[in-house]
C-alpha cells in the first residue's frame, strides 16, 4: 500500500496515484470515509502503456488550486505540476473534470484516470498496482517544483495579459475619428445590429486598437480571437493579424453569442451578457444565471447576474450542484463589461465613421507611440 499523504507537497494538496485492480481489493480510505470498491479491471495499465498511448489523464475538480480555464489557458497549481510531469514523460496531459471527490475516487478505481487531484488535504491510501508510474513520479519530483509552478501561475495572473502598443482611445475627437478601423466597425457591426461605436469600445478594451496584439493564451489581433475560435468561424489563422479579417471573426462570434442568449429579449441586457461571455465564456455566465434564478433574482438582468459572476470565485458557489462549469475569476469579466459600457458612452458624440481615413495608413503621430506590456 502507498501512503500518498507524505507526498502531499507534490501538489500542495493531495495527489493520488492511479490504481487499476485485477480483482477486488481493500476499500479506499479517504478523508470523507470509506469508498466502496467493487470495480474489476482485467488488465494493468502502467507507465509503458501510458507513454505508448501518448496521453496522461488527470482527473480533478475545478478550483483555483486544482484546475480552471482562464481566457483560454488552463491554470491551477496541480494542473501546472501535472503538465510538467506529463512533459517529462513525453505525453500530452488530458484533464477530466469531475463533479466531486467521490467521482474522483471512482475514476481512479475504474482506471479512467492516471492521476487524481483535489483541494482537500487528508490521508489517502491506494493499492500500488502501477509501480512504474509511482517510481517515475517519485524520481521526477523535487520540492522546488511547487514554488516554481506557483511563481509561473502568479506571473501569468499578475502581468498584463496582452502584449500590445498603446494607442489613444480616441484618434481624433474633433475630426470624429475613433480609430483607424472605424469603417470596418461600421460595416460589420450592421451584421450583428450593434452600434459601431460599441464594437470600437470593445476593440479598445481587447487590444487598444493594436492589430498585432497577442495575449499570453494565444489570442490575436484587434478583437483578440483565439486560433481555435478562428477555425470554428471559418477564418484562416494566418489572417488574424489582418484588421478586417479579425473584425469579421469577432462579428461572427458575437452573432453566435447573441443567438446563444436569444432568451434574453431586452437587447441592451442581452448585449451585456454577450460581452461577458466574450470575455469569460458563455458556460460560466449560464452558471451565474442559474444561481441568480435559484435565489429569486432575475436571470435576464445583468445587474443581478453579475453579482453571481463574482461569486463564482468562491467555493460555496463554484462547488454548488447547480454550477456545471466550476470556478471563474469573475471580477475581470464584470470589470470588462463595465469598462466597455463606459467607453461606449464616451464615444456617443461621434456621429459617423470618418470616410477619408484608410486603416492601412496610420498617421505619423502614431509612430511616436512606444511599445508596452499592458
Model-derived features: where do they sit?
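Low-complexity, Gly/Ser/Thr/Pro-rich intrinsically disordered linker/tail segments
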Residues: 332-374
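Extracytoplasmic small-molecule ligand-binding "clamshell" domains
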Residues: 26-27, 31-119, 185
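C-terminal motif of bacterial Sec signal peptides marking the signal peptidase cleavage site
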Residues: 17-19
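Substrate-binding/active-site groove segments that recognize
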Residues: 212-238, 246-256, 340
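Periplasmic-binding protein-like
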Residues: 62, 121-139, 165-169, 309-316
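Extended ligand-binding regions for polar small-molecule ligands
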Residues: 21-41, 47-48, 76-88, 124-160, ...
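Catalytic and substrate-binding regions of cell-wall glycan-acting enzymes that process beta-1,4-linked
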Residues: 124-126, 272-346
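Export/targeting segments at the very N-terminus of extracytoplasmic proteins
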Residues: 37-38, 160-209, 244-247, 262-265, ...
Amino acid at each position: 500500500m502507498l501512503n500518498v499523504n507524505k507526498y502531499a507537497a507534490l501538489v500542495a494538496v493531495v495527489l493520488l496515484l492511479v490504481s487499476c485492480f485485477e480483482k477486488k481489493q481493500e476499500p479506499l480510505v479517504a478523508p470523507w470515509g470509506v469508498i466502496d470498491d467493487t470495480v474489476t479491471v482485467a488488465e494493468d495499465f502502467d507507465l509503458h502503456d501510458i507513454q505508448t498511448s501518448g496521453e496522461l489523464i488527470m482527473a480533478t475538480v475545478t478550483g483555483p488550486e486544482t484546475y480552471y480555464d482562464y481566457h483560454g489557458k488552463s491554470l491551477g497549481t496541480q494542473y501546472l505540476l501535472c503538465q510538467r510531469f506529463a512533459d517529462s514523460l513525453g505525453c500530452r496531459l488530458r484533464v477530466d473534470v469531475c463533479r466531486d471527490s467521490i467521482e474522483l475516487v471512482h475514476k481512479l478505481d475504474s482506471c479512467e484516470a492516471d492521476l487524481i487531484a483535489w483541494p482537500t488535504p487528508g490521508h489517502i491510501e491506494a493499492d500500488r498496482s502501477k509501480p512504474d508510474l509511482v517510481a517515475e513520479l517519485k524520481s521526477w519530483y523535487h520540492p522546488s517544483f511547487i514554488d516554481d509552478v506557483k511563481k509561473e501561475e502568479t506571473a501569468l495572473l499578475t502581468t498584463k495579459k496582452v502584449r500590445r502598443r498603446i494607442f489613444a482611445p480616441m484618434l481624433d475627437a474633433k475630426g470624429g475619428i475613433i480609430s483607424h478601423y472605424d469603417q470596418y466597425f461600421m460595416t460589420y457591426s450592421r451584421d450583428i445590429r450593434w452600434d459601431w461605436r460599441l464594437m470600437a469600445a470593445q476593440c479598445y478594451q481587447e487590444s487598444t486598437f493594436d492589430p498585432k496584439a497577442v495575449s499570453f493564451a494565444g489570442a490575436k489581433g484587434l478583437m483578440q480571437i483565439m486560433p481555435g475560435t478562428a477555425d470554428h468561424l471559418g477564418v484562416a489563422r494566418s489572417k488574424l493579424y489582418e484588421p478586417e479579417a479579425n473584425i469579421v471573426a469577432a462579428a461572427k462570434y458575437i452573432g453566435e453569442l447573441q443567438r446563444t442568449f436569444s432568451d434574453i429579449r431586452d437587447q441592451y441586457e442581452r448585449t451585456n451578457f454577450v460581452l461577458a461571455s466574450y470575455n469569460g465564456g458563455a458556460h460560466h455566465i449560464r452558471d451565474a444565471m442559474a444561481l441568480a434564478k435559484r435565489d429569486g433574482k432575475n436571470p435576464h438582468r445583468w445587474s443581478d447576474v453579475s453579482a453571481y459572476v463574482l461569486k463564482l470565485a468562491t467555493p460555496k458557489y463554484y462547488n454548488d450542484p447547480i454550477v456545471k462549469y466550476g470556478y471563474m475569476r469573475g471580477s475581470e469579466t464584470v470589470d470588462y463589461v463595465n469598462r466597455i459600457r463606459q467607453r461606449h458612452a464616451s464615444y456617443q458624440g461621434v456621429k459617423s465613421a470618418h470616410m477619408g481615413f484608410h486603416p492601412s495608413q496610420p498617421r505619423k503621430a502614431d509612430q511616436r507611440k512606444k511599445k508596452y506590456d499592458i
